[in-house]
């Protein structure tokens, strides 16, 4: 997937999906796929999304993102988006709503079709809404499609709802709404060698900066190593109080991994379901026994969910 350059507007007519798209949940995907569908009409599907969260820049949110920028771009490409346009929010945050649409969406992007969610706002202080966008699109002869809210069990599907689910440990429902698995990729670092007690290595990882933090506890997970192999994992997200930890880390045991040294490699960890809260055990033996029991549950969840879908 390529980053859209301003000069391209002279030769390309586009279908533009507007939004920040944190998590690319069910509702977001309806927006994205509406733009992708316009390929049949000869339009190039483009996603307009800021490089930084506007809420974070404005100090309105500090609960973290549902996916990294890298994951977002990979997912957009898998959905059929061919180009992204990701300007610095700080450079456009004081632009009026009218100028934003006329200069950026119609001007730079040459949009002939625009799609956004029902609650999309734009321009300085978020002054623009879908009513204004419709007016401007009508005046320009540009088609506008506004996606109505996606609902699940009576709740409007939103990034805010999913962040709450993640913080509560309700990863199973969060994954359902995300249409993917919440997780992260990070370098494997040295830990306290707990894996030696368990018979196979554990992998220690720092969570990516600004990622939403799940409820502290043990999760069934799916771990993909650099060689492409996927293993069932038992992941502890928290501070590891039994071994005197104080810093937030992810530590994952892969009971079926026997592949040797993997420190320094990057592993992708996807959380499948919550097993139990983090607990301080009286000794390492109790911790080892608990993790061994958790592995039985994790394998059942892995076989149910990861191999056959969310």
Region locations from a protein language model:
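N-terminal Rossmann-like or analogous alpha/beta NTP/dinucleotide-binding catalytic cores
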Residues: 56-118, 122-139
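Phosphate/ribose-recognition catalytic cores of enzymes acting on nucleotide-derived substrates
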Residues: 13, 191-310
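N-terminal catalytic cores of NTP/NDP-binding nucleotidyl/phosphoryl-transfer enzymes
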Residues: 6-68
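Residues at the starts of beta-strands that form the adenosine-phosphate
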Residues: 42-46, 82-83, 112, 143
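Glycine-rich, Lys/Arg-enriched anion-binding loops that position phosphate/diphosphate groups
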Residues: 137-238
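Residue-level signal for inorganic ion chemistry
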Residues: 25, 76, 114, 174, ...
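A short acidic, often aromatic-flanked loop/helix-cap motif at beta-alpha or helix-coil junctions
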Residues: 9-12, 91-94, 151-155
């Amino acid at each position: 997937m390529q980053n859209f350059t301003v000069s391209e507007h002279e030769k390309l007519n586009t279908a533009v999906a507007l939004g920040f798209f944190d998590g690319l949940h069910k509702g977001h995907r309806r927006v994205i796929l509406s733009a992708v569908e316009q390929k049949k009409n000869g339009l190039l599907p483009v996603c307009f999304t800021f490089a930084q969260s506007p809420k974070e820049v404005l100090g309105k949110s500090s609960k973290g993102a549902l996916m990294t920028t890298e994951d977002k771009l990979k997912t957009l490409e898998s959905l059929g988006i061919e180009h992204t346009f990701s300007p610095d929010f700080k450079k456009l945050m004081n632009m009026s709503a009218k100028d934003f649409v006329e200069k950026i969406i119609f001007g730079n992007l040459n949009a002939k079709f625009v799609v956004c969610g029902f609650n999309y706002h734009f321009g300085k202080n978020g002054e623009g809404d879908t009513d204004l966008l419709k007016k401007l699109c009508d005046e320009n002869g540009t088609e506008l499609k506004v996606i109505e809210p996606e609902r699940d069990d009576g709740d409007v599907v939103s990034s805010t709802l999913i962040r709450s689910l993640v913080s509560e440990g309700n990863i199973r429902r969060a994954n359902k709404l995300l249409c993917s698995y919440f997780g992260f990729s990070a370098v494997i670092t040295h830990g306290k060698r707990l894996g030696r007690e368990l018979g196979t290595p554990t992998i220690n990882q720092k969570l990516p900066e600004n990622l939403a933090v799940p409820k502290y506890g043990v999760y069934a997970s799916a771990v993909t190593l650099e060689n492409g192999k996927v293993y069932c994992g038992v992941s502890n997200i928290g501070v590891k109080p039994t071994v005197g930890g104080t810093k937030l880390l992810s530590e994952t045991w892969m009971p079926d991994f026997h592949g040797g040294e993997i420190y320094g490699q990057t592993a992708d960890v996807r959380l499948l379901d919550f097993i139990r809260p983090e607990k301080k055990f009286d000794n390492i033996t109790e911790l080892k026994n608990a993790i061994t029991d958790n592995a039985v549950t994790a394998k059942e969840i892995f076989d149910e969910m990861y191999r056959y879908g969310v």
